[in-house]
């Protein structure tokens, strides 16, 4: 696209070596930035119309900051010299950074090419990039959005490499945020009480274990966080930040940090492993600004494709394309005779068999989850039973995809890498050494250093049953450590989880292990290299057992390696690459969480459900908790499909009117959902075929992009009722507003590419 220049004066400034004050301007089709002689962004401008400067006068933005972890200090640019498409930034500690700045049509590409001398620098940070936008906070992918009709502008950034992740360098644990902050997107309609201020932080609700109880703040000015790529200041102004770290040498971290301490989730210490070859040189981001209404499909999609970022597709379209959002069937009841028929009648594509047990990551089965010859016949029909492979192949004939819920990277007892012969690549929190020999029955285990071993492993829940060390190939459970020499572990159980208690010699390593949480999630966390293999294992499951969709329960366990979003990106990059090598379609997945690390790869986020998410009878987002409101706000802010979670089973009492409302609301807000389907309940419903037609009609119109923005806004109004009918004998649909069960005002809708 040919760039638009605001004025001859602006053009002259762009062509000159520098402005009168040493500043320079750079621009895209939609965005202009001004950088001063010190290397700070002092101007952010909407190129499409006259606008205010979105850069706060009192808070310029450093192009690049440096961070020294040992002394916990930032260094900011003091001088900036531009030439040949590159900035030379000088810092107080003597470091000099070379940053390339490439003006693309729709974004700026920034890349750190060199930093010499390092002088103690462990990490670099892009920004913070401060704005005076106060409306919508996109904390996951880093975006400040003003969605008002008067402004309609967004400023954001995207990481262009795996080692550049959202957040600030000062938070070395990289676990990410939890809890709520105070931020009102609309101070006129939702003013803050006098007792609250912008940016104030609160813990989530409950006991820190029951995840449903986390969501306990229904007021619109309480914003739950699922990322720290953007934040607000005390005035509600949104800033954006990404960072990259030298990971070649391990560091002691304290995780999580930067959040109010939540009961049963108190931080733990962890010695993070070395990651050879992974450094901050080459760190790169795309910085962009555009009208908010075109940001996702015109700008973000362009960045993703141009920079070779993950671009998974579903039904031939990018998974982030709002016309590609659709419900997935989520089964219960264990009977499968008619489920595929239901899916075809509704025009849906995925059958997520939630009535199957949680799938455990077990490399020992080679991806053959029902045995090497598919011996296990787990899918039940009235006249037969089928293996996963057989059922997946049957569904594939009709273009349908089979999915399962798995426990992410938790390696359960009895699996190849956990027990009875544990891998040497389990994630280690701390390494200590024996100071005395052990025979097979000794429970007096003497070690050289007790530091941090009193902590119950894993900050998420601190499950006492999972507090263990590994010596050789033996797992040993313990609780506590003596405080005085000779140091020893207390309350010891040898040969834990079926491992063999054996002789160990003085000097052997005593490795405290990182677990997941208890209950159905019980297991150990892999180190990065073993996690890479687990990622490929999930692709093996798709290849050998026929699955095409996963629901990653315990998805937050990817953070437990100590590497936050880097760990998440690395896992999914390996999984998708292996699937591509096998010639498989992109794997569709949802999970327990969503993060900057999974945003590009993840298709949907059908977490939670029921009345906690959406109450169709009361027509409210979460009648029992604030989960519906909270997750709706997070997803919308970060250009991701919202969700009703697992919801809306068809039963004997179900009505067409309910599903007209469900679908209208789903399209109004851009929602998917895990559509709960149990064959016996569906067959009890007198209106089942009419409900199937409702789902199909609305979803076909959604895929055709038939709903303009003004219609979508009306569909969000819970006080209104709707009916959508396909036009007879021609393309398009008629949308009726229903009043007391009768058709009222009507709207003609057509596919977006239609000539109408």
Q: Residues of each region from the PLM?
A:
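Extended Gly/Ser/Thr-rich low-complexity repeat segments
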Residues: 38, 97-107, 120-135, 453-473, ...
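Aromatic-lined carbohydrate-binding/catalytic grooves of carbohydrate-active enzymes
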Residues: 312-431, 514-539, 543-570
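Glycan-recognition surfaces
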Residues: 419-426, 516-533, 577-684
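Carbohydrate-recognition beta-sandwich/jelly-roll modules
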Residues: 26-360, 394-402, 549, 679-682, ...
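Active-site and adjacent substrate-binding regions of carbohydrate-active enzymes
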Residues: 112, 534-578, 591, 660-670, ...
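Autoprocessing Asn-cyclization modules and mimics
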Residues: 408-501
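C-terminal motif of bacterial Sec signal peptides marking the signal peptidase cleavage site
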Residues: 16-17
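Carbohydrate-binding surfaces of carbohydrate-active enzymes
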Residues: 391-404, 410, 427-428, 669-756
């Amino acid at each position: 696209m040919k760039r638009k220049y605001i004025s001859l004066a602006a053009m002259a400034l762009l062509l000159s070596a520098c402005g009168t004050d040493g500043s320079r301007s750079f621009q895209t089709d939609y965005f202009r930035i001004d950088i001063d002689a010190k290397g700070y962004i002092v101007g952010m401008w909407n190129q499409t119309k006259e606008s205010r400067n979105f850069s706060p006068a009192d808070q310029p933005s450093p192009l690049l900051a440096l961070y020294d972890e040992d002394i916990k200090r930032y260094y900011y640019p003091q001088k900036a010299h531009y030439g040949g498409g590159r900035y030379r930034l000088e810092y107080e500690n003597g470091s000099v950074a070379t940053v390339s700045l490439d003006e693309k049509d729709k974004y700026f590409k920034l890349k750190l090419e060199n930093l010499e001398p390092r002088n103690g620098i462990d990490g670099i940070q892009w920004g913070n990039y401060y704005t005076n936008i106060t409306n919508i906070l996109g904390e996951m992918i880093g975006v400040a959005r003003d969605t008002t009709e008067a402004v309609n502008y967004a400023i954001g950034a995207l990481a262009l490499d795996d080692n550049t992740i959202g957040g600030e360098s000062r938070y070395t644990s990289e676990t990410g945020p939890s809890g709520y902050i105070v931020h009102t997107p609309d101070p006129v309609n939702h003013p803050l009480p006098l007792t609250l201020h912008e940016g104030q932080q609160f813990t989530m609700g409950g006991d820190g274990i029951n995840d449903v109880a986390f969501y306990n703040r229904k007021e619109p000015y309480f914003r739950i966080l699922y990322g720290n790529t953007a934040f607000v200041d005390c005035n509600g102004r949104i800033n954006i930040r990404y960072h990259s770290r030298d990971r070649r040498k391990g560091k002691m971290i304290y995780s999580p940090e930067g959040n109010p301490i939540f009961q049963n989730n108190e931080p733990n210490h962890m010695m993070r492993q070395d990651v050879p070859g992974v450094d901050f040189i080459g760190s790169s981001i795309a910085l962009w600004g555009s009208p908010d209404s075109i940001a996702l499909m015109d700008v973000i999609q362009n960045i993703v494709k141009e920079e070779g970022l993950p671009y998974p597709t579903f039904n031939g379209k990018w998974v982030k394309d709002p016309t590609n959002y659709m419900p997935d069937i989520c089964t219960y009841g264990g009977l499968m005779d008619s489920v595929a028929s239901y899916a075809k009648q509704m025009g849906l594509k995925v059958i997520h068999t939630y009535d199957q047990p949680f799938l455990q990551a077990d490399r020992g089965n080679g991806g053959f989850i029902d045995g090497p010859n598919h011996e296990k016949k787990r899918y039940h029909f009235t006249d037969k039973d089928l293996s996963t492979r057989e059922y997946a192949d049957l569904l594939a004939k009709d273009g349908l995809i089979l999915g399962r819920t798995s426990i992410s990277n938790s390696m359960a007892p009895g699996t190849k890498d956990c027990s009875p012969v544990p891998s040497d690549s389990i994630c280690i929190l701390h390494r200590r050494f024996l100071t005395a020999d052990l025979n097979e029955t000794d429970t007096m285990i003497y070690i050289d250093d007790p530091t941090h071993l009193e902590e119950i492993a894993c900050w998420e829940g601190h499950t006492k049953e999972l507090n263990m060390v590994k010596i050789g190939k033996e797992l040993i459970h313990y609780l506590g450590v003596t405080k005085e020499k000779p140091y020893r572990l207390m309350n010891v159980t040898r040969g834990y989880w079926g491992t063999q208690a054996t002789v160990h010699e003085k000097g052997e390593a005593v490795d405290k292990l990182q677990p997941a949480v208890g209950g159905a999630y019980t297991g150990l966390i892999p180190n990065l290299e073993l996690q890479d293999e687990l990622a490929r294992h999930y692709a093996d499951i798709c290849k050998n057992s026929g699955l095409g969709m996963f629901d990653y329960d315990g998805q937050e366990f990817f953070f437990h390696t100590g590497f936050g979003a880097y760990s998440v990106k690395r896992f999914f990059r390996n999984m998708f690459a292996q699937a591509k090598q096998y010639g498989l379609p992109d794997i569709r997945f949802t999970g327990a969480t969503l993060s900057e690390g999974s945003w590009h790869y993840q298709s949907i986020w059908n977490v939670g459900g029921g009345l906690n998410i959406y109450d169709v009878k009361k027509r409210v987002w979460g009648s029992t908790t604030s989960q519906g409101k909270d997750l709706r706000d997070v997803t919308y802010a970060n250009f991701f499909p919202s969700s009703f979670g697992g919801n809306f089973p068809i039963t004997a009492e179900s009505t067409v009117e309910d599903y007209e409302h469900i679908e209208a609301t789903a399209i109004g807000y851009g929602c998917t959902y895990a559509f709960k389907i149990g064959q016996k309940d569906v067959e009890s419903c007198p209106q089942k075929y009419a409900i199937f037609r409702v789902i199909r009609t609305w979803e076909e119109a959604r895929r055709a992009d038939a709903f303009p923005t003004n219609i979508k806004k009306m569909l969000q109004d819970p006080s209104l009722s709707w009916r959508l009918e396909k036009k007879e004998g021609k393309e398009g649909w008629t949308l009726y507003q229903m009043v007391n069960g009768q058709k009222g005002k009507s709207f003609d809708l057509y596919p977006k590419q239609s000539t109408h």
